[in-house]
Swiss-Prot record:
Residues that span the membrane, as ranges: none
Binding-site list for ATP: 12-20
InterPro entries referenced in this protein's UniProt entry, alphabetically: P-loop_NTPase, PRK, PRK/URK
Protein name (Swiss-Prot/TrEMBL): Phosphoribulokinase 2
Pfam families, per database record: PRK
Recorded name of the encoding gene: prkB
Keyword match Cell division: no
Keyword flag Magnesium: no
Family stated for the protein in its record: Belongs to the phosphoribulokinase family.
GO molecular function per UniProt: ATP binding; phosphoribulokinase activity
Organism: Cereibacter sphaeroides
Amino acid sequence: MSKKYPIISVVGSSGAGTSTVKNTFEQIFRREGVKSVSIEGDAFHRFNRADMKAELERRYAAGDATFSHFSYEANELKELERVFREYGETGRGRTRTYVHDDAEAARTGVAPGNFTQWAPFEDNSDLLFYEGLHGCVVNDEVNLVRHADLKLGVAPVINLEWIQKIHRDRAQRGYTTEAVTDVILRRMYAYVHCIVPQFSETDINFQRVPVVDTSNPFIARWIPTPDESLIVIRFKNPRGIDCPYLTSMIAGSWMSRANSIVVPGNKQDLAMQLILTPLIERMVREARRARA
């Protein structure tokens, strides 16, 4: 953690909805005049697309059917921790971009499935924003939690997460349902051992819960809408969080536990704005004072 150069880490698996959360943060940053630098988690994958395919084939031939992008060893977590540490100490660091498709290739000049060159962060930033799979990993080799000042988890109930991933990968990446299902199965071991434990380290978790039948996500024709969902928001330490105020400001919300509130799915953005804006404002104010 760093008073001068704070770090916000948002963790969620593929299809969890972290991009929506990132958009809300960008709105807050813009409104509050916060200059941020950002890291996308896939920038720290260890392999490009071709090399990952070869590594998957090698491991499968050796009897390992669990290796995936969720796995620790498929990612440069020591390098990610080094960047977190450097930013917290100096406000400097570096990142790159993983190019997913032709549109990104046209913008970056790099073929899909490859990385851009490493590039330094812009100077004079207020904070670092990370969004990806591994921003709160604690294991025998790295401890990313100790570097992050605000840690958020985005964890829909599992069937909803699968529905969102299937629909996203079919629409944006041209995969078949069967291909996405194979990916889900291969990732399950690392999901349980590498992704899920991070949600015990986060300060706030946002869990979307559908109120329609999602019992077979592999045949679902559409993603449950916000109006067909609830959001459970859990605070690791509710001290300083005025839950009665939040429930009074958000129509249809209530406290389900002393550290949890439930809001209608179409109020997620409002809830995040109300919860996160004062936290970010205080974090940035104290950081600017410490740097002065």
